[in-house]
Amino acid sequence: MGFKGYILSIVFNGKDFANKYYLMLKEFLKQHNLRDKIALKVVLANDEPASNLYVSIKSRVAKEIGLNVEVIKFSANSVQSDILEVIDRENKNLSTDGIIVQLPLLKGMDLNSILNSIVYSKDVDGLSFVNLGKMILGDKKGFIPCTALAVLKILRDEGIKTLGKTVVVVGRSPLVGRPISILLSSKPYDATVIACHSKSIYLDVYLRQADIVISAVGKPRLIDKSMLCGKPYVIDIGISEIETDNGKILSGDTDFDNIKECVKFITPVKGGIGPVTVLMLMFNTIKAHLINNRMFDVLNRLEKLLEV
């Protein structure tokens, strides 16, 4: 359960949060006669179990709300030109609204070349240079990376104010950390952002100043309660596997059990930011269809429904 005003939910439930909006999107598509008319293509060029799981979740959600989704899977002996050829085909395919590439890629492939081969109007992950540039300039017709958009959505719906607050973002990747830092320091969020990373020597000093901590470095249990002060809000995006006496378990960047009593709000590793990221991918895909078909009045209604 979220909160309004002073009522806080200590541990965020991303599944319930996202499910509420999935139902809204399903009804939205039905109302506007858009069910089964919007197509998402997912390029999968690795054989990692985690990637296959993530793709299956995205596909299931897309189908449940009424989108068409196709997973284009490449074998381990595929080369970069194979992927570029398929992306070029889907760029030209008028029935394709969104194209995403599930990361990581096969070894030897150039990430930027592949991401930037997706035409920006179908880049619903928002990871191309064009869309990252649009984000920096505040162009609302661009696509914001889904995880960064998920962070904004959580902050807004959970009533976590950013105006004038100190936000420490741990992580500087162009996929997650950097977009979050740029967005939160911009209007209308107007936060004072301290951008750190895994090699920041005085990380604990910066963290103690934070009203809000957002971490996305993939270093398990990097942040513990000794590094926090004043019960901040914590959004933990990192995910890693660690060995324990009972086998491998998932861990975030924070030592969850260690800090959960020392914060106002925290996202867990399982059922935290992940479902909301998938939600924002659905939002971006529907948005792409509406922009490409110049359905701007319907787009306005969509943006009011999923306001960030």
Swiss-Prot record:
SUPFAM superfamilies given in the database record: Aminoacid dehydrogenase-like, N-terminal domain, NAD(P)-binding Rossmann-fold domains
Single GO BP term: purine nucleotide biosynthetic process
GO cellular component: cytosol
Top-rank taxon: Bacteria
Gene3D superfamilies: Leucine Dehydrogenase, chain A, domain 1 (3.40.50.10860), NAD(P)-binding Rossmann-like Domain (3.40.50.720)
GO molecular-function term, one example from the UniProt record: methenyltetrahydrofolate cyclohydrolase activity
InterPro entries reported for this sequence: Aminoacid_DH-like_N_sf (IPR046346), NAD(P)-bd_dom_sf (IPR036291), THF_DH/CycHdrlase (IPR000672), THF_DH/CycHdrlase_cat_dom (IPR020630), THF_DH/CycHdrlase_NAD-bd_dom (IPR020631)
Keywords assigned by UniProt, alphabetized: Amino-acid biosynthesis, Histidine biosynthesis, Hydrolase, Methionine biosynthesis, Multifunctional enzyme, NADP, One-carbon metabolism, Oxidoreductase, Purine biosynthesis
Binding-site residues for NADP(+), renumbered to this chain: G171, R172, S173, S198, I239
Family label: Belongs to the tetrahydrofolate dehydrogenase/cyclohydrolase family.
Name the record gives this protein: Bifunctional protein FolD
Protein species of origin: Borreliella burgdorferi (strain ZS7) (Borrelia burgdorferi)
